[in-house]
């Protein structure tokens, strides 16, 4: 199947947002129960923390930390595990650190046009003495706009 979600039968997500002045933060706790399609996998748990600082009306700095845990229950994004590698797509733990800069071309309508530039470091583990897991850097550039 081409299912790209967590692979869990049931998922619970608790999110929290807060802001004060130029600073805002988002947090999300996740739990997925009953992983399907991966032998030996049961449950997956995760956390996302994303503080954002508005530098100016046009610029915003973003940091994001993500972690996920579960016995062979964490499914890595396909951009980390392309078909030409020998890294497993399912791991026991994953941590990612994202640092980005957003540029709003129309700050009075922030969803109109946004330029994004970021770097991300991902480290993952498989609790096995023979298996290696993905650890590496990604560089992102994007243009987002809304009609």
Regions found by a protein language model. Give the residues of each.
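Outer-membrane beta-barrel pore domains
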Residues: 2-147
């Amino acid at each position: 199947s081409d299912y790209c979600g967590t692979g869990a039968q049931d998922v619970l997500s608790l999110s929290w947002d807060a802001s004060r002045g130029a600073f805002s933060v988002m947090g999300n706790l996740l739990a997925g129960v009953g992983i399907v399609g991966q032998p030996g996998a049961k449950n997956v748990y995760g956390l996302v923390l994303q503080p954002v600082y508005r530098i100016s009306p046009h610029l915003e700095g973003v940091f994001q930390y993500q972690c996920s845990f579960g016995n062979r229950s964490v499914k890595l994004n396909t951009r980390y595990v392309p078909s030409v590698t020998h890294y497993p797509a399912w791991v026991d733990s994953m941590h990612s650190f994202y640092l980005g800069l957003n540029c709003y071309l129309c700050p009075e309508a922030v969803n109109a046009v946004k330029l994004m530039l970021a770097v991300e470091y991902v480290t993952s583990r498989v609790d096995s003495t023979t298996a290696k897991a993905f650890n590496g850097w990604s560089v992102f550039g994007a243009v987002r706009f809304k009609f």
